[in-house]
């Protein structure tokens, strides 16, 4: 993106954060609640078992980037996930990475990943609007604010990624985005029914 486009995206993020703060003040209301409690968020240190899984998923190419991990639960997104999975019989779940710029993480943690975020800088949408996950950590590192990140052009000494449990259906594997930049569910079903 051009410098002007990047500046406008950053201003949109900042405006979203100001409106988020206004919402926080309204939603917390109860002086006994923390902001995290008001938004249904629970943060806890990752257990040794969690860290072992994370390091395994990072693989040899990214294990040196690991610094610290937290377990984050958003009660609303967890409920939606369980509701979606319920009654579907046997479904496959896999762990996939999602990387994003540092300034996007409060919104992601608060609302979950959304198709068209209004107050986040979008680093790319190779296949149109969607929720993007990667099986390899290296791909997601490229979308963080970490110095040298490929897609986000990060300049920070740190970056954040999340390891998500994702319901995994019938995959549609592609090697490039030729003709797929405006992909949506209806078009996908015509091209690859059942995906």
Regions found by a protein language model. Give the residues of each.
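Segments that shape or occlude catalytic/ligand-binding pockets
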Residues: 27-30, 41, 71, 79-195
